[in-house]
Amino acid sequence: MRKSLKTIDIISLGCSKNLVDSETLMGLMEANGYACTHDSDDPQGEIVVVNTCGFINDAKEESINTILEFAQAKTEGRIEKLFVMGCLSERYLADLEKEIPEVDGWYGKFNYKQLLKDLEGEQFEACEGHRHITTPKHYAYIKISEGCDRHCAYCAIPLITGKHQSRPMEEILDEVRYLVSQGTKEFNVIAQELTYYGVDIDGQQHIAELIDKMAEIEGVEWIRLHYAYPTHFPWDLLSVMRKHNNICKYLDIALQHISDNMLTRMKRHVTKEETYNLIERIRGEVPDIHLRTTLMVGFPGETQEDFDELIAFTKWARFERMGAFAYSEEEGTYSEQHYEDDVPEDVKQQRLDKLMRVQQRISEEIEAEKVNSIQRVIIDRQEGDYYIGRTQYCSPEVDPEVLIPVTDRWLEIGEFYDVLITDSEEFDIYGITIK
């Protein structure tokens, strides 16, 4: 393998699925002689690659502003080349090429590996590389599929990523084995629609089989499941969660709403009654499970009665974790083309604020119940006077963290410790290690 003097800085925007793509590209680049950095505050590389997000308006604006920032850097001679990849360029390529000519190459969601070939010329034969993990090495995201077949009325993701495509199971398991060999202990399994895994291959859901096999791999300490869908939920997955101690009692399942009016208009293909039954059964079959969900307010046609149903459901379900947002139109979606955005912005915000106040009280009560319990905690980092860690119930970056005073004892990053929880807030938990 020849060496290259070129250095590349990859700026990864958006979700964890985008991050996996960035890490895959970095591994490929490094295998072919490039030095790579990731999301540095002051990129020093001759080449910058921006991996964009195009999901919602705020994400689009962030992506465009980032591209323009580096286009200016190129104009000023601070970088040599600028490339763009990801969801935004997948969807708006023609417009972007016209408006930002400073970009040397545009790549979408699936053809970004072509970038290396374009850099090196037609005669260059790329060496395959392993992902370059940019998170702390003890945890990683495992993307098991691309795309989505659900076509919810508000969602632009299928317009960007296309139909659901499951990765081969053995390919996923090989990746897990490799990452274990590199020191990874925690695996956060992600997909646009986790529970659909395998349906595109043979018409059957294989998520339970995949997670069962993943849990059997020696060295896998934690598996956490993200982005399940309520329709046709695979009940055998709950059996697998009970079977293995290294599968976290945690499930991220986006529900969006509860009223039948909203669920129908959103094209969610699930009913209010089915949703209540789903939550009740999950909690019944996996005791102590922590559920994370996402809810939406202000969708076209949402009445006060619809919103009141959502509040009542939230109080009943007592989700341990919740993200919520106000509806905004996304170009090309069913709702943008067929519904009037008729809920006033101030009403959307009022409803969002009320929903989050309700959830805040629930979250505080749930975390307070953990005080005086002993939890297994993995240490992510040290910040000032505290080690920062997480329990099995906490996903990286989005959930509460455990703060342990550095005066308690010396702790190793990436290791597990038994921690006595001494206090809690909505977003922070405090504890001391059990010596």
In which residue ranges do the predicted regions lie?
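Proteins enriched for Cys/Gly/acidic motifs involved in redox and nucleic-acid/cofactor modification
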Residues: M1-Y197, L251, E273-E280, G284, ...
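Short, glycine/charged-enriched secondary-structure capping and boundary segments
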Residues: T24-M26, E62-N65, E97-I100, E120-E125, ...
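Conserved SAM/AdoMet-binding glycine-rich loop
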Residues: E80-G86, R91-Y92, L96, S181-E305, ...
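Glycine-centered loop/turn positions within well-structured domains
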Residues: K113, R150, T195, D260-N261, ...
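Terminal RNA-binding accessory module
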Residues: Q337-K435
